[in-house]
Amino acid sequence: MKALITGAGGQVGRALQSTAPPGVSLLALGSGQLDITSADAVTALVEAERPDLIFNTAAYTAVDKAESEEDRARLVNGDAVGFLSSAARQTGARLIHISTDFAFDGTASTPYPPDAPPAPLGAYGRSKVVGEVEAQNGALIARTAWAYGSHGHNFVRTMLRLMAQRDEVRVVTDQIGTPTWATSLAQALWRMADASARGIWHYTDSGVASWYDFAVAIQEEALALGLLDRAVPVIPITTADFPTPARRPAYSVLDKSATFALLGGAAPHWRVNLRKMLKDIQTHG
């Protein structure tokens, strides 16, 4: 089996490579190797390589910047998915596309099921919903949330840096979701692909947290592992205290019950996977 991975240098792209099952031939490409916004480039590569699976982890993820660059966000997160989907259909490949909790407006009080109507709050979310529509026709669309990994820019890395540099950190406490380790997501994606899952599915780690809860846990676990040498106050603030160009959903917990049933069990709790990720940093840097 051959699998094409776009966005190979990102958190999920790296995790897919490190968790690939035995016997899978990987073609992992970054933006410098494949411009997914070029329909001709996508078609030519897919026709030449003939992958069985196409994992699209490439994305425009600058949530705030997207408010002033919506055309660019839509091109990468929306139109380009259509190019990949078309190439997949033409060659018989299966597309596995990564989407987001930002598809929802956050007004719910219970986890969002996969068939909940999308209602994005901003440009980034709108662009990702366009991508979901473009990816239809047999694709697996996996919505996830609050992803982080050992590499790249993410909340865990940012908190570790700030906690080492500052006398206190301030973190919003009124946005609720579920932190998700990229390795956990990647392992699930391989299994879902093996099960020939299609349509929209939800996957995050188990449990619920605010960004404040997540930050507190990061400090506690990092101190226990010696990644931080001192504790600093973590101050809870509200979203109103920390205005940003893009609005964020206040509640974006996803209902994973169907996915967990497909996989034969629930994902580990987010704090368990946080500890695993920090141990990976401790070992490999």
Model feature map: region roles:
Residues P22-A44:
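Adenosine-cofactor binding site in Rossmann-like domains, unifying the SAM/SAH pocket
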Residues A188, A195-P245, G285:
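Mid/C-terminal beta-alpha module of Rossmann-like enzyme folds, strongest
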Residues S68, L75, A80-F83, A103-A142, ...:
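Catalytic helix-loop patch of NAD(P)-dependent Rossmann-fold dehydrogenases
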Residues S150-H151, Q175-S184, T204-E221, K276:
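Substrate-binding strand-loop-helix patch
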Residues H269-G285:
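Amphipathic terminal alpha-helices
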Residues A3-A20:
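N-terminal Rossmann NAD(P)H-binding glycine-rich loop of SDR-like oxidoreductase domains
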Residues I36-G78, A87:
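NAD(P)H-binding glycine-rich loop region in Rossmannoid oxidoreductase-like domains
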Residues V133, N137-S184, W190:
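NAD(P)-dependent short-chain dehydrogenase/reductase
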